[in-house]
Amino acid sequence: MAESLKEKTAKGLFWGAMNSGSTQVLNILFGIFLARLLSPADYGIIGILTIFTLIAGNLQSSGFTQALVNIRKPTDNDYNSVFWFNVLVSLTMYVVLFFCAPLIADFFHQPCLTSLSRFVFLSFFISSFGIAQNGYMMKNMMNKEITIVNFMALISSNVVGLVLAFNGMAYWSLAWQQVIFILVLNIGRYYYTGWRPNFHIDFGPVKKMFGFSVKLLVTNIINTVSNNVLTFVFGRFYPINDVGNYSQAYNWDTKANSFVANTVGQIAQPVLASIQDDKNRELMVFRKMLRFTAFLSFPLMFGLTLVSREFILITIHEKWIASVPLLQILCVSGAFMPIYTLYQNLAISKGRSDVYMWCNIGQVVGLLALVLFCHQYGIQIMVIAYTLFIIVWLLVWQWMLKRVAGLRFRDVAKDILPFMLCAAATMVATYFITRSLQNIYLLLLVRLLVSATIYFCIMKLLKVQILEECIAFCKRGR
């Protein structure tokens, strides 16, 4: 049993890494070309709509994907109930937002948002037809199939976006990119899952899941507000170009930290839920995931902080130079975001969606207070305050999970701090070794090679178990 779970977890991490890795590589490549063709204003306009699309998506899914994963043996009726509930809720939300579109355009002083938002909001309605299938794939840990589906959706949507941008469609190219991505994603989910909805509609299972899922719904909405509150505020109070520069920085930060968060998050909840009755084993597995997360996250995000200026100048050129300091600041908090993902999955796997909800309510209240206090001081000060708050709030999560799961702070510190300090020392050493280089192409290449070499050597010298296990797994060719 233990060996079976270990093997399943290892394979899940492998395909999760393949999924996240291919996703981020494609996003980076297509993102570079799109950023060269489009302006900060184009990204700013789409960025304003993000919070509305995501909140509507939260309402539409209503936390039932996680609820399905948490059920030991979900039935066809469970999936069917979730399917029809999601479709009906998303249709209602789309109608409401369709008529609210002129109000959104007026609030942000951007008349183009009326027609644009009505089109972009189609994405969450289309998405509702694949929520149950997504829950099925996650429950059955179909990580290989999830990787393939995401890959095809990314290729299709980005090619469409790139062609439209090349033909002068401006922000409409980003809108079409979003809609096509969701459409292809759903087609792939239907192709790989054997389950199909039927017209025997029974909302009984939804009612049973509601107590658990409603807390996730509230929390997901709060998470969305938390992650996008700065874009919303910037869109209201600052020029659209400033919003675009922040959106670009936030996108690159998210692309990087999502690689780690999605790699681990894809398997964390199903694995932890499967052993929730064995508290000691659950904590042992969680701490191993935590070490793996820290092992990847800190060097990746601190490394991006180090090379962000060269990266932006080389890839998307000088018109985006104003996004560099914002990206450098965001990457510091971005290093901790995958740890948030793990903490959240532990709370959900314990069936404590209330902990998940209240931790995030407190977080968004704190962020709103920061926004009210700091928005008068400019974008950079707001981003610094946001970063510090995100790091500090992790202590609140730790305190709650100590009570819920027995997760001790000293154990977490023992798992995280060595990787954080090694990554920070690596980047400081790399900076001083390479600071005399003037050519930005050479500087980017050398910094990447030097930092990777130093970090790898430190891990080998310290005989870090996570590294040895990763090497052994790759050698087995699985």
Residue ranges and their predicted role:
Residues 1-28, 66-69, 73-84, 113, ...:
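N-terminal membrane topogenesis motif
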Residues 1-5, 9, 144, 187-228, ...:
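Interhelical loop/hinge segments that connect adjacent transmembrane helices in multipass membrane
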Residues 2, 402, 407-409, 431-478:
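Membrane-proximal transmembrane or re-entrant/amphipathic helices at the cytosolic face
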Residues 5-64, 89-101, 123, 153-162, ...:
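Signature of the first transmembrane helix
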Residues 6, 10, 67-76, 126-150, ...:
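Membrane-interface junctions at transmembrane-helix termini in multi-pass inner-membrane proteins
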Residues 12-27, 174-177, 181, 185, ...:
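Transmembrane helical elements of multi-pass membrane transporters/channels
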Residues 27, 58-76, 138-139, 249, ...:
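Helix-loop junctions and terminal segments of transmembrane helices
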Residues 114-121, 149-194, 208-212, 219, ...:
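Hydrophobic alpha-helical transmembrane segments
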